[in-house]
């Protein structure tokens, strides 16, 4: 729905613990790819980018943060944001168990979209 509103600029934010090695995270890259697929952006770049066709990913590393991902839609009138904040790592463990149970007896390469039957 919002992808048709061209008055909005989109950016992504992610925050993880200081020991996380990849920047941006795989989740941020997947979110960026989904936004790009459904918008006028051509690619993503670590913020700040001066290219209006590149989606900014603002990646931060801080102490005692499990994980935060945020998609912002900004216009001159308002900002709409969708945020996921992991308060602990239990959800990540549960996701790993669900994926392990799902993959029993299957061969190939899969993503969470397959496990969740999204595409």
List the predicted regions and their residue ranges.
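Rossmann-like dinucleotide/flavin-binding elements
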Residues: 1-5
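C-terminal substrate-binding/catalytic lobe of Rossmann-fold NAD(P)-dependent oxidoreductases
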Residues: 6-119
């Amino acid at each position: 729905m919002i992808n048709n509103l061209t008055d909005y600029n989109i950016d992504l934010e992610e925050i993880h613990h200081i020991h996380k090695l990849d920047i941006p995270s795989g989740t941020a890259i997947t979110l960026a790819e989904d936004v790009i697929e459904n918008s006028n952006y051509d690619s993503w770049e670590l913020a700040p980018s001066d290219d209006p066709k590149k989606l900014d990913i603002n990646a931060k590393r801080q102490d005692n943060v499990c994980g935060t991902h945020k998609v912002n839609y900004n216009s001159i009138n308002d900002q709409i944001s969708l945020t996921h904040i992991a308060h602990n790592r239990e959800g990540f463990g549960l996701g790993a168990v669900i994926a392990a149970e799902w993959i029993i007896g299957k061969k190939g390469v899969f993503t969470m979209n397959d496990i969740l039957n999204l595409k």
